[in-house]
Amino acid sequence: MQLNPAEISDLIKAKIENLSVNAEVRTRGTVISVTDGIVRIHGLSDAMQGEMLEFPGNTFGLAMNLERDSVGAVVLGEYEHIKEGDTVTCTGRILEVPVGRELVGRVVDALGRPIDGKGPINTTLTAPIEKIAPGVIARKSVDQPMQTGLKAIDSMVPVGRGQRELIIGDRQTGKTAVALDAIVNQKGTGVICIYVAIGQKASSIANVVRKLEEHGAMEHTIVVAATASEAAALQYIAPYSGCTMGEFFRDRGEDALIVYDDLSKQAVAYRQISLLLRRPPGREAYPGDVFYLHSRLLERAARVNEHEVEKLTNGEVKGKTGSLTALPIIETQAGDVSAFVPTNVISITDGQIFLETDLFNAGIRPAINAGISVSRVGGAAQTKVIKKLGGGIRLALAQYRELAAFSQFASDLDEATRKQLEHGEVVTELMKQKQFSTLNTAEMALTLWAINNGSYSDVPVAKALAFESEFLSFVRTQHPEVLEAVNASGAMSDESEKTLEAAMKSFKSSYAYQA
């Protein structure tokens, strides 16, 4: 076979002309050192703050310290296989997590990967974990209730949609129980719930998931878990991941509720990362930006107006407001609310529910201290009937606590003081509620109505809860229309009150409640 040199040169020219040279420009660096999940990298001159970095073995990290001649990064997950001299590549992307309806009912890790053994999650959308909170113009005032189903909270420290209400207390005071009741109570309301577990034992998280499944709450809940055995970096980013998942619903004109359990452990994880990155320590060895750590997270919980929702959905959703309500949890040490992290979060949130060990041990559960628990914006969002009937509850409890302290020293009490003490005892007893036995608006209104009109004046304190339960059952069977009317209108008419007065008289004549 004879080869023609001209043909060969033409072929080579054609190949050169058709050659596509699309060079992928990605900055590469070299690992200098690896210690405790912190990697120092040389040569990443173009790295961004918070950028995802790719390590060998399909491992990712987060660029956190951008120094003159090196980058300090934190590894998201296992780091044992990373060694000195390994090549690190910039991805050019900020850390993103999957978002969407497909996540509802699933348990995922801090990066949105499923860990419940139910197969992959087929989401098409992702969103960055760090976002700027809605501005002043984009927001709408909080005026819709987020019912928790707990008498003590909904009557004294009401929570509104788009509010941030802190749950604070020592270990083992029922903080998680209050949050789980709030999640269970959203069943059938269309509110999507996100439960973020930070630094808890895997067995505790499994227990929470099991309880939510038992009460049919997993159907509207996403669980984001960063267990105690996982890297500090994952515990640090878990709340931001959960918040991004909640914002997906908020920005589409829906309502979402997010529980951070708990932010004390996130602050500890962040302190660990910061100290390993050699950032200067401040008070209690926390870094200087620990306030910003929580403020930028909690400011993202808000109620956004119709225009903002319309803008975010490109006109798909019109005339609807969206909200993300946050229930952050903080664990105190020996009731010290003046420590660094508790005071920070108290100042960021719109009120706090303070749970006390002494009340919990005395059997008053939820163990809410009515004196220092407040809701700064929830009053405007309270249901009309609960606002009207529950106004005297906080006052009755506060006066009772004060008088109870004095009555220990006084041997003879006048009639008015004795009556006030008895009333306070009954109110304290009726504010008790078992876990997962939430009440709707009408059932709560019924109890508050009975307290206000003196129906419990002749009921022994020990029998008050049984009396309440029996009377509720009596009204449910004999006068269901009253409960339906209150639930529908959010108010109690004079006609309903007359019906209830007659029902109470009839019930008392047939029910043996006296001691």
Swiss-Prot record:
CDD domains: ATP-synt_F1_alpha_C (cd18113), ATP-synt_F1_alpha_N (cd18116), F1-ATPase_alpha_CD (cd01132)
Chief location of this protein within or outside the cell: membrane
Gene3D superfamilies attached to this UniProt entry: 2.40.30.20, ATP synthase alpha/beta chain, C-terminal domain, P-loop containing nucleotide triphosphate hydrolases
InterPro entries (alphabetical): ATP_synth_asu-like_sf, ATP_synth_asu_C, ATP_synth_asu_C_sf, ATP_synth_F1_a_nt-bd_dom, ATP_synth_F1_asu, ATPase_a/bsu_AS, ATPase_F1/V1/A1_a/bsu_N, ATPase_F1/V1/A1_a/bsu_N_sf
Keyword terms of this UniProt record: ATP synthesis, ATP-binding, Cell inner membrane, Cell membrane, CF(1), Hydrogen ion transport, Ion transport, Membrane, Nucleotide-binding, Translocase, Transport
GO cellular component, one term: proton-transporting ATP synthase complex
Catalytic activity, as annotated: ATP + H2O + 4 H(+)(in) = ADP + phosphate + 5 H(+)(out)
Role of this protein: Produces ATP from ADP in the presence of a proton gradient across the membrane. The alpha chain is a regulatory subunit.
Listed name of the protein: ATP synthase subunit alpha
Lineage: Bacteria, Pseudomonadati, Pseudomonadota, Betaproteobacteria, Neisseriales
Name of the gene: atpA
